Amino acid sequence: MSATETKYVPRLYKKYKEEVVPILQKKFNYKSPMQIPRLQKIVVNMGVGEAVQDIRQLERAVEDLRAITGQQPVITRARKSEAGFKLRKGMPIGCKVTLRKERMWDFLDKLISVALPRVKDFKGLSPRSFDGRGNYAFGIAEQIVFPEIDYDKVDRIRGMDIIINTTAETDEEAFWLLSLLGLPIRSM
């Protein structure tokens, strides 16, 4: 890479480094910069229960998830058999993507600025969705809130779970980190 070329830096990562880090450092009195919470990964999971009867449903879900995240999803399989759901161990039942680095920051930016504002009757994310270890999980009921999904080509509405994994020690630290990044979480 020559001196004139600039490396791509995601907009939200730049905001994290320039604005969020100093605020968190001051608020929680961290001694070392390595103590400051940061994002580790974002996992986007789409459970497709209909895949048991119709495998094409899973293929369409994989296509949707690939379009939304820009990364090839991995198919998740049943861990154990469940007669009530006509499910056998090893059957495909969903797909997921683990995003890290630039793709993670780009996805979070798109989620905050485009997808969540398009959710009907959206009043902010619940502050109760923290897990006690600084991670945050929530669900989106419709994949059509993402701009990559063509509304006319959607065969059925599918939801997804989004898990944001941080290095924060407590829920309060994670709340401040995600709120300062712009995630619309209702106050605790």
From Swiss-Prot:
Keyword tags: Ribonucleoprotein, Ribosomal protein, RNA-binding, rRNA-binding, tRNA-binding
Coiled-coil regions listed: none
Gene3D superfamilies tied to this protein: 3.30.1440.10
Gene Ontology CC entries for this record: cytosolic large ribosomal subunit
Pfam families reported in the protein's UniProt record: Ribosomal_L5, Ribosomal_L5_C
SUPFAM superfamilies hit by this protein: RL5-like (SSF55282)
UniProt-listed PROSITE patterns: RIBOSOMAL_L5
Single GO MF annotation: tRNA binding
Domain of life assignment: Bacteria
GO-annotated biological processes: translation
InterPro entries on file: Ribosomal_uL5, Ribosomal_uL5_bac-type, Ribosomal_uL5_C, Ribosomal_uL5_CS, Ribosomal_uL5_dom_sf, Ribosomal_uL5_N
UniProt record similarity statement: Belongs to the universal ribosomal protein uL5 family.
HAMAP family per record: Ribosomal_uL5_B
Function according to Swiss-Prot or TrEMBL: This is one of the proteins that bind and probably mediate the attachment of the 5S RNA into the large ribosomal subunit, where it forms part of the central protuberance. In the 70S ribosome it contacts protein S13 of the 30S subunit (bridge B1b), connecting the 2 subunits; this bridge is implicated in subunit movement. Contacts the P site tRNA; the 5S rRNA and some of its associated proteins might help stabilize positioning of ribosome-bound tRNAs.
NCBIfam families named among the record's database cross-references: PRK00010.1 (NF000585)
Oligomeric and partner information: Part of the 50S ribosomal subunit; part of the 5S rRNA/L5/L18/L25 subcomplex. Contacts the 5S rRNA and the P site tRNA. Forms a bridge to the 30S subunit in the 70S ribosome.
Protein name: Large ribosomal subunit protein uL5
